A protein has these predicted regions:
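Bacterial N-terminal signal peptides
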Residues: 1-6
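Conserved beta-alpha junction segments in alpha/beta enzyme cores
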Residues: 14-128, 134-260
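Sec/Tat signal peptide C-region and signal peptidase I cleavage site
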Residues: 9-13
Length: 260
């Protein structure tokens, strides 16, 4: 049984506006490799690789979240940067959500500093879904324990894409109405905490934005779950459960080619 608690915000419709935007931030894969011993770790002495660009070195996208040396082999689905801008006529805030493991404070500050003042944003939140199936964006999951897996060129692109997504959301601002929902999950939902103190937040929180005619503009969903369902042997870039949630909310869930 699903219980939903809904509150509707009393904001003057002509003043309250919201805008959404999204764009892919999937890294480009260059070299190819074969995991000979199936340990999901690249070892030049054991595994085979192809120097696609002919530069004499293994150009890897090092995947974050589990062991070191986990080099991506393919792309299952796109990683996304999703932005929402909320403006109540007095304050304008921007939220950027990205399918990354995490983002360092220095990087987030640089994103904020590069956003033009003319855009009128009072606050910008840059959020990572904590995706364990994307590139290393924090320097902890490179080719060895003491070597970073961060690609500087990708990080520069990431910052530009964040700002572009934010601008698109501003351009998409439109009159909106807002409602809030708190959804307790089924006790069988597989959320675990293996480290003390055991703290589990099993509620789903949602903010829905509608046009005055009732049609949906977009939503914000918060659910405390590790984005790591593909687990540590996966070598394909994917947005994992966060991507499935976004696509399911936006387009519905299909099973055996049927919308359920």
């Amino acid at each position: 049984m699903l219980f939903v608690i809904i509150l509707t915000a009393q904001v003057h419709a002509s003043e309250f506006k919201v805008g959404f935007a999204k764009m892919p931030i999937t890294p480009n894969l260059i070299d190819e490799w074969e995991d000979i011993n199936n340990d999901a770790q690249f070892d030049a002495d054991i595994d085979k690789w192809t120097d696609i660009n002919g530069n004499g070195r293994f150009d890897a996208v090092w995947m974050a979240g589990f062991q070191n040396k986990r080099a991506a082999q393919g792309i299952k689905d796109d990683l996304m940067s999703v932005a929402v801008v909320i403006d109540d006529g007095q304050t304008r805030i921007g939220i950027i959500s990205a399918d990354t493991i995490g983002l360092m404070r220095k990087f987030v500050l640089s994103v904020r500093e590069d956003v033009p003042v003319e855009w009128g944003l009072d606050y910008i939140m840059v959020h990572a879904t904590h995706n364990h199936e994307g590139p290393d964006t924090q320097g902890l999951w490179g080719p060895s324990f003491l070597r970073s897996g961060v690609n500087d060129a990708y990080m520069k692109r990431l910052k530009k894409d964040f700002i572009r997504t934010l601008k698109m959301a501003i351009d998409n601002l439109e009159t909106a109405e807002m409602s809030l929902a708190l959804i307790p999950t089924n006790p069988l939902t597989p959320i675990k905490d293996k480290r003390k103190p055991i703290v589990i937040d099993d509620d789903i929180r949602a903010i829905l934005f509608n046009r005055p005619d009732g049609s949906i503009i977009g939503s914000l969903i918060n659910f405390g779950i590790h984005v790591e369902l593909a687990w540590d042997k996966n070598l394909d870039i994917t947005s994992d459960v966060a991507g499935y949630l976004r696509r399911g909310i936006s387009h519905g869930i299909y099973y055996d080619d049927k919308l359920i």
